Regions:
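Membrane-embedded alpha-helical signal segments
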Residues: 1-238
Length: 238
């Protein structure tokens, strides 16, 4: 299964004999860790109201598992009535598929391994052998590259253009940066991919900028805090 972020999801297993689950319930695990749990009703449809919906349809009221929006599991004979009242109707299997896809995107940083990264390098090496040979492991060890890609994925930064990422790492190799610092430093090289996620090519993109002094203060705080995030002094007055 391919994820649009540029990695392949590991194989998935489906277990139907978990006696600890209630009827109609399902769980999603990453490794042995339960990361999500919800219910689907295979004999019903999930109806999600829109802004134009006025009539309330009878059914099992829930929040959809992916986005937490108010929804109703309705019986089949109410589908036409719901559609006429501007409900969006979703099949139960689509509910699970959307939830699973969201989990894969959210936990993609946990899913990618050194073997996965090596597979990505092998694939890229077919068209760019010299680039691979000059970067990994000469400039960046495989385990460091894995950390860098994990960091990007955790922040939902796509790694589709691995070639650009490696080229950026080549230019940064002399700066003796940690994997965390390299993760941040490669962002400008893939800025076009980041922008494409939030804006079409012909659209204007509204941005918010900080005062240069405040920005430098945040950068300094980030370096001091490390992997714990940015720790801002509560006494700070802007």
């Amino acid at each position: 299964m391919t994820i649009k972020k540029g990695i392949y999801a590991a194989s998935m297993s489906v277990f139907k004999d978990d006696l600890s689950l209630d009827a109609n319930s399902y769980r999603i695990r990453v490794g042995h860790t339960i990361v999500a749990q919800d219910k689907v009703y295979v004999d019903r449809k999930l109806a999600m109201p829109s802004d134009e919906t006025q009539l309330k349809i009878q059914g099992i009221q829930v929040k959809d598992p992916t986005f937490g929006l108010e929804s109703i599991w309705i019986e089949q004979h109410l589908v036409s009535k719901a559609e006429a009242n501007h409900y969006m109707i979703i099949e139960p299997e689509a509910v699970i598929a959307t939830h699973l896809n969201n989990i894969l995107l959210r936990y993609s940083g946990d899913l990618i391994s050194q073997d996965d990264v090596q597979s990505l390098l092998d694939n890229l090496g077919k068209s760019n052998p010299q680039l691979i040979q000059s970067v990994v492991p000469k400039l960046v060890p495989l385990h460091h590259l894995t950390i860098i890609l994990r960091n990007l994925l955790v922040e939902r930064v796509p790694i589709n253009d691995l070639k650009k990422i490696l080229e950026a790492l080549t230019n940064l190799s002399e700066r003796k940066l940690s994997p965390e610092e390299l993760s941040e430093a490669v962002r400008p090289a893939i800025s076009s991919l980041l922008i494409q996620k939030i804006s079409n090519i012909n659209e204007s993109l509204n941005v918010v900028t900080f005062n240069p002094e405040f920005e430098q203060m945040l950068i300094a705080m980030s370096k001091k805090s490390g992997s714990e995030g940015i720790l801002i002094d509560p006494e700070l007055v802007l």
